[in-house]
């Protein structure tokens, strides 16, 4: 049995059924090496992407603060963008890469608004992927895009049976896999 599709399609399938995906939604999937962006409005209407991901954030912090990669990763996932004593330095380190993602997201949104016939007003931004595991990233996107944004959390809507859910800090990584697991059996090729 086989199913091949772009990862953003699997993400969209999951979010459409669990995260108010019936609303016109911007999906920002921040993977380790790249970010995929999609507009979901009944189906995927527009996509975009760039070669900046969670690993880029870690490298940015390590370079800017002159610390080892392991320490940079810890600062990223523990402190991130939320208020605190170290945040100014972290925000300054992360800002250039985050700004590139914001600009590409705005470009995709603008294309949807200007070129897609019958489009509806975009209602929300859902951030997924391992790179979404940064405290304060939802608020950062909300402020930058002037639209409600948050890290997607579809887990409460999924039936794991006897399997244990992934640990909270790893959940954003499994969004694509969970979306693939939601493929109706009739769509699979034997």
Stretches with model-predicted labels:
Residues 1-190:
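Hydrophobic/aromatic-enriched cytosolic interaction surfaces used to assemble or bind macromolecules
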């Amino acid at each position: 049995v086989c199913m091949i599709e772009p990862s953003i399609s699997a993400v969209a399938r999951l979010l459409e059924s669990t995260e108010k995906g019936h609303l016109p939604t911007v999906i920002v999937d921040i993977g380790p090496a790249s970010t995929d962006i999609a507009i979901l409005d009944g189906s995927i209407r527009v996509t975009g992407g760039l070669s900046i991901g969670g690993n880029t954030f870690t490298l940015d912090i390590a370079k800017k603060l002159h610390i080892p990669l392991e320490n940079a990763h810890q600062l990223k996932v523990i402190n991130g963008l939320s208020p605190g004593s170290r945040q100014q330095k972290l925000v300054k380190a992360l800002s250039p890469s985050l700004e590139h993602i914001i600009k590409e997201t705005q470009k995709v949104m603008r294309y949807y608004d200007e070129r897609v016939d019958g489009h509806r007003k975009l209602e929300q931004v859902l951030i997924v992927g391992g790179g979404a595991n940064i405290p304060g990233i939802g608020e950062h996107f909300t402020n930058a895009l002037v639209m409600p944004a948050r890290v997607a959390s579809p887990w409460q809507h999924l039936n794991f049976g006897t399997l244990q859910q992934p640990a909270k800090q790893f959940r954003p990584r499994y969004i694509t896999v969970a979306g693939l697991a939601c493929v109706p059996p009739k769509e699979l090729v034997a």
